[in-house]
Amino acid sequence: MTTVQQVYEVMQRLAPPELAEHWDNPGLLVDCGGEVHRVLVTLDITPEVVAEAVAKQCTVIVAHHPVIFDPLKRLCPADVPYQLVQAGISAICMHTNLDAAEGGVNDVLADLFGIRQRTAFADGCGRVGDIDPITVPELAALAQRKLAALCNAPDTGAAVQVKFADTGKPVHRLAVIRGAGGSLFAEAIAEGADCLLTGEANHHHALDAKRLGLSLIAAGHYATEFPVTAAVASALRAALPELEVLVSTDNRDPYTYL
């Protein structure tokens, strides 16, 4: 018999809690106990994902984004933690510790782009290393193709939207930061990167990075993080072969792209 605690222990080995940022809230955030036969892996726990878990008879959801982040002052039926408890589904969430962990979110992203001799930077928030020379428009197009192939397709519009600020220099050294990493462009420059590929970057991040000689590619928060779900599922299957581990097909980018 596999327990919720056993699943949590595997996830703690994969993403050690001590790697989490001080402000974060990873862990076993909803514990309904009971036997576990089937697990659903996702980026976000949304009402749609809870319904998917119920339909697929999954009693544990393993997610990246914490389903409880700020202190709860009340619960109502529209709240996802309420829905989880009502359905008897436990939630294990590994956030910045999974970002920083070896084989975690950033390493999966680095693998996609063939980053060699990689090192961690920005306190584990990113990875940087060498790639075969490529132009920024070519790299952005490559990101579009690779990430779209690994994300759940939306009902309408493109699966992934990529935008870039190009200095005009070819990329030999690439930095990647999952999710909202645009503010860390200075750290990428300090590592000698020609380009930073991240999920989100604002207008001023792009202006400043380009002025300082760093190209910037923003490929979407969801798109740069969802690919880790397959890696987490594989790790769980290897550690607990008696479990059936599924990757969510209903966790999609909240944005629709034209």
Task: Briefly describe each language-model feature range.
Residues 1-258:
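Hydrophobic structural segments
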